[in-house]
Amino acid sequence: MAAAGRERQMSEAGADAPVGSRLTDTVAAYSTRALAGGTTIAALFVLLVAGAIFPDSIAGTLADVLTSRNTLASALRLSVPIAFAALGGIFAEKSGVINIGLEGLLIISAFTAIYVTDLTGGIWIGFVGGVLASTLLAGLFAIVTIEFRADQIIAGLAVWLIALGLAPFASQVIYNGPNTPTVPTPDAISVPVLAELPFFGALFSASPSVYLLFLSVALSWYVFERTAFGRWIRASGENPKALDTAGVSVRGVRYAAVLLSGVLAGMGGSAFSLDLGQFTGNGPTMVNGKGFIAIVAYLFGNYNPVGAFLSTLLFAGLDAIQTVLQLRGIGIPRQLIRITPFVVVIVVLALVGRTQTPEAAGDHYESGEE
């Protein structure tokens, strides 16, 4: 009864929102993304047909790469840190807190996971250590932005810069260099028979982190669509006054969402370094912009966990294709692939006008504010 009353109060308090305008924006956003997806599928179909007809042409080579099991396996592996960070970004931003410090959370968790694994000898202990480090840094970000009402963009950049300096420095102090020694990597999980399939077999013979990602995407979707907590997060980002009127703490919901973003980003960073067995801290570190691509992914996915995952898989797939083509002697500049996600989102934003950004994202809120 209490929960139902809260839902009614939230609906009544938010009745003045421009529903028609928001609905129009939503339809436009999804229509454009559907058009982009349909165009991509059609282009892939044409390429595969051309490759089958002319196997010795560049189309044939591309078709061979696209249907390669190794390409799918590589795309899944590359998508892990980006997709986990994207899920974390969705939770934070849907609650009204813009967390652009995802890059920093990936960096700190990637280093800590390797360090704890090297210290204890336990891969999963290291994984948990990386998640805890990311969550602590996210907690610091939450205190600064929610409690002290700091600018969220500046605070997010500070998180990135802190991690960018701290992780290589710690590696230098502990290991006398920006790169850590190698540690054991987790064994792949293989499903008998299914793992032998020509292309989709890569789905059934992968690192545990890939299956953990699948589970996290499904659970994130369920939380947003089927739970009261998910509705509270959406209300906190769309109409915090309605949530406050219903008797739910906006501050508490935002703290929980930001900490959850730290957990998810930490899972991505830990899995990334542990799957490779090493942390490299040269330059922008091994993370190298994946946290920023995660932001692009959830924007392109319109703040939907499944959409963000599919966007991530698309971007990671382009990177995987580029890698395979390089191995086959067809050079495509890596920098060109790296800017593709950002170009795609700019095009989508130009066509749609804007993504369905939460109304109160970036705004501070105190209980009782008018």
Give, region by region, the residue ranges found by the protein language model:
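Cytosolic-side transmembrane-helix boundaries in multi-pass membrane proteins
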Residues: 1-50, 220, 246-252, 325-370
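Short loop segments and helix-boundary regions at transmembrane helix junctions
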Residues: 27, 93-98, 137-193, 286-289, ...
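Helix-loop-helix hairpins and the membrane-proximal interhelical loops
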Residues: 33-81, 87-91, 280, 366
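Inter-helical junctions in multi-pass inner-membrane proteins, predominant
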Residues: 65, 70, 224, 257-296, ...
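Single transmembrane alpha-helix segments in multi-pass membrane proteins
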Residues: 69-127, 131-132, 137-153, 299-303
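Helix-loop-helix "hairpin" substructures at the membrane interface of multi-pass membrane proteins
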Residues: 78, 205-280, 305
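Transmembrane helix-bundle core of multi-pass membrane transporters
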Residues: 164-224, 333, 367-370
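Transmembrane alpha-helical segments in multi-pass inner-membrane proteins
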Residues: 279-342
